[in-house]
Amino acid sequence: MSLTRSRKIALVCATAVLLLTAMLQALHFSRDSASSARQHLLQLVPADATAVIYVDLDELRASPFLAELYAWIPHSSEDSEYLQFVRDTGFSYERDLQRVVVAISNHGSVTNIFAIADGKFDRKKVEAFFDRNGKSAQHGKWKAFRLNATANEKPLWVAFLSNERIAFSDFENPSAGVSATPSDSFHGEWNPRFERLAGSPLFAVIRQDPSIESALNAAAPGGFHSPQLSALLGQLQWISIAGKPDSDQLRVVAEGECLAPLTASQLSDFLQGLLLLAQNGLNDPKLRQKMNPEEREAYLELLKSADIQKIDRGEWKSVRVMLEITPKFLDIARVASTAVPADQTSAPPENPQKPAATSKSKSRKKK
């Protein structure tokens, strides 16, 4: 009897071990598959890319933060063209888009965009839709569709690379982006930075370019502009920004790289000073009386989460800034984005002109 019981216990233990092993292997292969797809997408980036943006929608969908972000983004419920696309193709980017990489290449005054997306496509339906809304042509081994839509006033081309992968480009030659195999020097420059961001489902890597400084200045919030900060950012060779969901929050990490230790030190000191200045400003008694308490609390949470570090990687010197974006901050940002600007509100003129006196009033004064 005891022997039978021992065998049962041994059988249960063996079964549990086998199930656990199978689960671990499945998880391992699933992660390897996602990592392999990500790596392969990034290897297709054109060699002359200036900026690369990567988004893993599958990983983001598993996080509560995506729901918060989706609720924050304004939606157009009357986008008839997109609704027609969904009806005709059965493809919805909210549900079926898995991964996408976008490469931006600057050539002086000309900017080219090349994007590759992985998703659950019904290829026949999608190609039929493109055929109805554009013209098809064979470019090498690719059947490309020239769409009626444009990007930067240039024709937009789209082609299936496989049943699950599609490419978009505004190059004159639609196969130029896919056919341009990056060199070893390209991989040597970009891959270490891609690998550092391997745990982030959302990131952008930017190689220094004269247009980047202008774009960063244009994107400054609230019209904020600092010549000193612009000059320091202009001395960075690389900038990377990554986001990683953590429950209903998003951890954002921005890093600037340069070869000059002095530039890294000056940038770190400037950002530390800016952080301290912002914290002191929010604690100013006069500002606290004027400011919405919830808005102030959201900004304070953001600033308290900030961490600024200097990193030494041999010849490369980096400054890293980490922040945590909370649902409370998104709510405040949404309210701020929909608020009516002060210069558009109806206000009486500062020096209202008196109405001209009528002839009757003039005659009365003479009397």
Where are these regions (language model features)?
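A short, solvent-exposed beta-edge/loop patch
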Residues: 53, 152-183, 244-249, 309-330
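C-terminal regions of proteins
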Residues: 236-246, 250, 255-257, 288-315
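A contiguous, surface-oriented mixed alpha/beta subdomain in the mid-to-C-terminal portion of proteins
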Residues: 209-270
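Structural boundary/hinge residues at secondary-structure and domain interfaces
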Residues: 7-153, 197-228, 269-307, 320-327, ...
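Solvent-exposed, non-transmembrane alpha-helical starts
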Residues: 124, 176-180, 264-267
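Short, Lys/Arg-rich N-terminal segment immediately upstream of the first membrane anchor
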Residues: 1-6
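A conserved glycine-rich beta-strand in the N-terminal activation segment of trypsin-fold
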Residues: 154-216, 222-224
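Helix N-cap motif at beta-to-alpha junctions
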Residues: 119-122, 171-174, 257-263, 325-329
